[in-house]
Amino acid sequence: MGNRHAKASSPQGFDVDRDAKKLNKACKGMGTNEAAIIEILSGRTSDERQQIKQKYKATYGKELEEVLKSELSGNFEKTALALLDRPSEYAARQLQKAMKGLGTDESVLIEVLCTRTNKEIIAIKEAYQRLFDRSLESDVKGDTSGNLKKILVSLLQANRNEGDDVDKDLAGQDAKDLYDAGEGRWGTDELAFNEVLAKRSYKQLRATFQAYQILIGKDIEEAIEEETSGDLQKAYLTLVRCAQDCEDYFAERLYKSMKGAGTDEETLIRIVVTRAEVDLQGIKAKFQEKYQKSLSDMVRSDTSGDFRKLLVALLH
């Protein structure tokens, strides 16, 4: 995980003993001290929370997750438990949940797999194998089909070029290949799209999209919308959006999870928790710019209770 916006520790400096004691006290006896739980979980980095879990188990002989499960409930519990996982473990659990049982929640597979770096994909695959004793790739293959399966399997290879160099000639060639594979023929040749969208660096893709605009006179998004549909379209558009501006993509996902009637709490939790130490500050700025309101304010008006308090604390 890139730590360019890592959450600072508590002002007094991180003290794992004190935190473990405080959490134990918060869960002891009658009632639960939710404020103490919120303060510690939201005010520590992911690595520090791992240390607290280990310390807690060593000191009290109990798993902190199990203790919190018995003390908390609802979306507050879900968020607290999400914060106790390493980011790769939490993403792996989200993917497994999206696939298990009847039906598959493709939007979760797309959001997670289309937005991660090679290193993050590899960590998620390892966590999945460790937690569920199964291969993520095999499960994705078994749970998806057709061209969506192909692009997700391509992404699981973690084979994207992550260099900074831009090859203008390649951008022009890729733009032409994308045109020939989509608008330039009957039906769409998804292999060309997969090859380009799953393997080129984000910088290279931006050059390709520009070349496409010049060559064809329309946005790559427009072409994708005309040529594809359903989940495949969602996956391609997510890859394009993320190459252009991943923070913008997540800002929009957050906005859509809250606007209108009802709130998609799962998406809200997933994005706030998984982006907290990656690009949440940038997402907040983008959200403000796009919607003329702060993400914290919208979360405040859309959630309640301790769930709201924990999310708002994570957003600061």
From Swiss-Prot:
Coiled-coil annotated spans: none
Tissue specificity field: Detected in epithelial cells in colon and jejunum (at protein level). Detected in epithelial cells in jejunum.
Similarity field: Belongs to the annexin family.
Name used for this protein in its record: Annexin A13
Location in the cell: Apical cell membrane; Cell membrane; Cytoplasmic vesicle
SUPFAM superfamilies linked to this entry: Annexin
Membrane topology: Lipid-anchor
Protein's UniProt keywords contain Repeat: yes
Lipid-bearing positions (N-myristoyl glycine): G2
Organism listed in the record: Homo sapiens (Human)
Entry annotated with the keyword Magnesium: no
Predominant place of localization: membrane
Phenotype for S73C: Slightly increased dimerization. Decreases calcium-dependent membrane binding and location at the cell membrane
Pfam families in UniProt: Annexin
Signal peptide: none
Annexin repeats: 14-85, 86-157, 169-241, 245-316
Record keywords, A-Z: Annexin, Calcium, Calcium/phospholipid-binding, Cell membrane, Cytoplasmic vesicle, Lipoprotein, Membrane, Myristate, Repeat
